[in-house]
C-alpha cells in the first residue's frame, strides 16, 4: 500500500550558483559517500549530480510529510546507484522506497513513492 508520494523540481542554474561556495553547500546537502562520488565529477555533470540528489532528498521529505528540518535532514538521506545504475534511496525508514530522478537541460526532478513494508 502506498503511504506517501513526494516530488521536487530544481533549476540547475540555482544549484550551479550554490556550488560557487562548493564545499560548504556540498557538506550541507551530500553525505560523505555522495561527496566522494562528486569529487570525480566536473562542470554540468557535477551540477546534475548535486541537483538530482537535492531533488531526491526534498521529494523524500515531502513523501514522509515533514519536509527538510528537525525530523529529516539532508544528511539523513543518501542516494546511491544499484548495479544497473538505478538510483536507490538509503534512509532509516520502515517503508519500501521507490525513487526516480531525471534531468533536462534546465531542471532536475525527482519523485519518491513510499510503500508500506507490511502486506
UniProtKB/Swiss-Prot annotation:
Under Pfam families, the record lists:
ACPS
Its GO biological process annotations read: fatty acid biosynthetic process; lysine biosynthetic process via aminoadipic acid
Location(s) in or outside the cell: Cytoplasm
Q: Under which EC number(s) is this enzyme classified?
A: 2.7.8.7
- GO function term, MF aspect, one: magnesium ion binding
Q: Which cofactor does it need?
A: Mg(2+)
Q: Which UniProt keywords apply?
A: Cytoplasm, Fatty acid biosynthesis, Fatty acid metabolism, Lipid biosynthesis, Lipid metabolism, Magnesium, Metal-binding, Transferase
Catalytic activities: apo-[ACP] + CoA = holo-[ACP] + adenosine 3',5'-bisphosphate + H(+)
Signal peptide segment: none
What the entry lists under SUPFAM superfamilies is as follows: 4'-phosphopantetheinyl transferase
Q: List the disulfide bonds.
A: none
What's any one GO cellular component for it?
A: cytosol
Q: Which residues are involved in binding Mg(2+)? A: 8, 58
The EC category is transferase
What domain of life does the UniProt record list for this protein's source? Bacteria
Predominant localisation class: cytoplasm
Name the family the entry cites: Belongs to the P-Pant transferase superfamily. AcpS family.
Record's function text: Transfers the 4'-phosphopantetheine moiety from coenzyme A to a Ser of acyl-carrier-protein.
The name of this protein is: Holo-[acyl-carrier-protein] synthase
Q: Which organism is it from?
A: Bacillus anthracis
